[in-house]
């Protein structure tokens, strides 16, 4: 703690050259004025104060020494206990005032702003979820689900190859409804015999949320319209020969499809595609090294043949002598 100078002001004098009077009060009078603090900056008044004594201490008012009667007057000694109690009370009042002032200043301060860390979690996109589900289905991650899908699609295509679409749809709905209705009646019977709770065995699928929000419907509609418009524009450029090279490639592909159509119909082609989709991924996963080796050999042969053809076509004719 730093120290400051505390002074007791007695009287003003016109000059500092005059003698300093006695700091004790005159006879029969007691000085009850509190001890004051004097600023160290120059006083604006031309008069210079004189001081009886200098004390080095803290910023709080200091206690004065007990006042004694001047010698030769025969007065009794003045008791200093009441003055000390008064000065201690003044010190407590000053400390209380300072604490209240600091409390008011702290209340005026704004509370500290705690910046919370915001973690952004990437929302899974519907396209990625659909792609992951199809991949799991084709790689037989869930054997029962993959086997059920393959069997159902294969039987549906075989039925379509023999019957009309309306007949296949009607018989398929009858088969599904007969299975679900039988299971539901069975659970009701168990509940009547007090062997079950009678809950719907398909409650899990009934609780599944299949509704599309407005935003999802707009996204799907925009995606379908974009795909449709892109397909129409591509077919227009191919049929109207916007690029000669692309139109010739399209012509070759259509010509090869005529031979495929002569051997297979559309249902048979779809059936082969479905069987291949559920078969080739798992076979490739089991024999990946051998398949990659043969594929690299075929690609090298194809690149060599292509470079040979391009060299023959771009070879300039020999100059005649």
Curated annotation (Swiss-Prot):
Q: Where in the cell is it found?
A: Endoplasmic reticulum membrane; Sarcoplasmic reticulum membrane; Cell membrane; Cell membrane, Sarcolemma
Q: Where are the coiled-coil regions?
A: none
What keywords sit in the KW lines? Cell membrane, Cytoplasm, Cytoskeleton, Endoplasmic reticulum, Membrane, Sarcoplasmic reticulum, Transmembrane, Transmembrane helix
Its GO CC terms?
intermediate filament; sarcoplasmic reticulum membrane; T-tubule; terminal cisterna; Z disc
Return the annotated region ranges for Disordered. Answer: 1-36, 65-85
Q: How does it sit in the membrane?
A: Multi-pass membrane protein
GO terms for biological process, alphabetical? intracellular protein transmembrane transport; negative regulation of amyloid-beta formation; regulation of D-glucose import
Q: Tell me the ranges covered by the Reticulon domain, including all copies.
A: 134-321
TM region(s), chain numbering: 163-183, 250-270
- Any Pfam family from its record, for instance, is Reticulon
Q: What does this protein do?
A: Inhibits amyloid precursor protein processing, probably by blocking BACE1 activity. Enhances trafficking of the glutamate transporter SLC1A1/EAAC1 from the endoplasmic reticulum to the cell surface. Plays a role in the translocation of SLC2A4/GLUT4 from intracellular membranes to the cell membrane which facilitates the uptake of glucose into the cell.
What's the name of the protein?
Reticulon-2
State the gene name recorded for this protein: rtn2
């Amino acid at each position: 703690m730093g120290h400051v100078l505390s002074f007791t002001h007695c009287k003003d004098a016109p000059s500092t050259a005059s003698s300093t009077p006695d700091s004790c009060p005159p006879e029969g009078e007691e000085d009850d004025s509190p001890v004051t603090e004097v600023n160290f900056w120059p006083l604006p008044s031309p008069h210079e104060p004189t001081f009886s004594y200098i004390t080095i201490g803290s910023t709080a008012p200091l206690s004065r020494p007990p006042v004694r009667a001047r010698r030769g007057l025969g007065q009794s000694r003045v008791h200093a206990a009441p003055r000390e109690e008064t000065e201690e009370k003044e010190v407590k009042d000053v400390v209380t005032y300072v604490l209240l002032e600091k409390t008011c200043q702290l209340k005026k301060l704004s509370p500290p702003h705690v910046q919370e860390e915001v973690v952004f979690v990437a929302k899974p996109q519907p396209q990625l979820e659909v792609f992951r589900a199809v991949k799991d289905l084709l790689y037989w991650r869930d054997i029962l689900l993959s086997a059920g899908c393959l069997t159902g699609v294969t039987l549906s295509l075989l039925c379509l190859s023999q019957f009309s679409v309306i007949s296949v749809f009607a018989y398929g709905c009858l088969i599904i409804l007969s299975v679900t209705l039988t299971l539901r009646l069975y659970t009701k019977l168990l509940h009547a015999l007090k062997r079950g709770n009678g809950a719907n065995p398909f409650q899990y699928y009934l609780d599944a949320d299949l509704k599309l929000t407005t935003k999802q419907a707009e996204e799907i509609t925009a995606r379908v319209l974009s795909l449709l418009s892109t397909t129409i524009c591509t077919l227009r450029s191919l049929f109207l020969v916007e690029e000669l090279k692309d139109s010739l490639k399209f012509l070759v592909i259509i010509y090869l499809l005529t031979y495929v159509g002569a051997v297979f119909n559309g249902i048979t082609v779809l059936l082969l595609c479905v069987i291949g989709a559920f078969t080739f991924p798992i076979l490739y996963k089991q024999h990946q090294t051998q398949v990659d080796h043969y594929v690299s050999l075929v690609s090298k042969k194809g690149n060599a043949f292509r470079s040979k053809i391009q060299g023959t076509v771009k070879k300039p004719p020999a100059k005649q002598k």
